Amino acid sequence: MLATRVFNLIGRRAISTSVCVRAHGSXVKSEDYALPVYVDRRDYPLPDVAHVKNLSASQKAXKEKEKASWSSLSMDEKVELYRLKFNESFAEMNRST
């Protein structure tokens, strides 16, 4: 009877200690919902932020060309500028899966 109590106590401590050790290193990172986020939704057509946040050198050059006349831009450059702001077009969003 005494041995059963001792093993019971040791077993409980071992379990609770191992649970504490496992839970100690895990940090849960919560998302800050105060900051605007990008969403692709038909009912929310203009998101608060652009799809691409960190621009490459070629993307920055295209953004500089955007400040000039749009008639001087090719169709591919216009599509590239669109893709910087949006991930999907309305046609792509409306496409059935």
Swiss-Prot record:
| Protein location | Mitochondrion inner membrane
Name any Gene Ontology BP term. Answer: mitochondrial electron transport, cytochrome c to oxygen
> Which Gene Ontology terms of cellular component type are present?
mitochondrial inner membrane; respiratory chain complex IV
Q: Which residues carry this modification: N6-succinyllysine?
A: K29, K60
User: What positions are modified (N6-acetyllysine)?
Assistant: K29, K53, K60, K67
Cite the InterPro entries for this sequence: Cyt_c_oxidase_su4 (IPR013288), Cyt_c_oxidase_su4_fam (IPR004203), Cyt_c_oxidase_su4_sf (IPR036639)
Q: Annotated pathway, please? A: Energy metabolism; oxidative phosphorylation
Describe its membrane topology: Single-pass membrane protein
Does the entry feature the keyword Mitochondrion, yes or no?
yes
Report disulfide bridges, numbered on this chain: none
Q: Matching Pfam families, A to Z?
A: COX4
* Lineage: superkingdom: Eukaryota
Modified residue Phosphoserine is at which positions?
S56, S58
Transit peptide, residue positions per record = 1-22
Q: Which UniProt keywords apply?
A: Acetylation, Membrane, Mitochondrion, Mitochondrion inner membrane, Phosphoprotein, Transit peptide
Instruction: Indicate the transmembrane segments per the record.
Output: none
Which stretches are annotated as coiled coil? none
Q: How does it assemble?
A: Component of the cytochrome c oxidase (complex IV, CIV), a multisubunit enzyme composed of 14 subunits. The complex is composed of a catalytic core of 3 subunits MT-CO1, MT-CO2 and MT-CO3, encoded in the mitochondrial DNA, and 11 supernumerary subunits COX4I, COX5A, COX5B, COX6A, COX6B, COX6C, COX7A, COX7B, COX7C, COX8 and NDUFA4, which are encoded in the nuclear genome.
Q: State the function annotated in the UniProt record.
A: Component of the cytochrome c oxidase, the last enzyme in the mitochondrial electron transport chain which drives oxidative phosphorylation. The respiratory chain contains 3 multisubunit complexes succinate dehydrogenase (complex II, CII), ubiquinol-cytochrome c oxidoreductase (cytochrome b-c1 complex, complex III, CIII) and cytochrome c oxidase (complex IV, CIV), that cooperate to transfer electrons derived from NADH and succinate to molecular oxygen, creating an electrochemical gradient over the inner membrane that drives transmembrane transport and the ATP synthase.
Similarity-based family: Belongs to the cytochrome c oxidase IV family.
Name of this protein? Cytochrome c oxidase subunit 4 isoform 1, mitochondrial
**Species of provenance:** Sus scrofa (Pig)
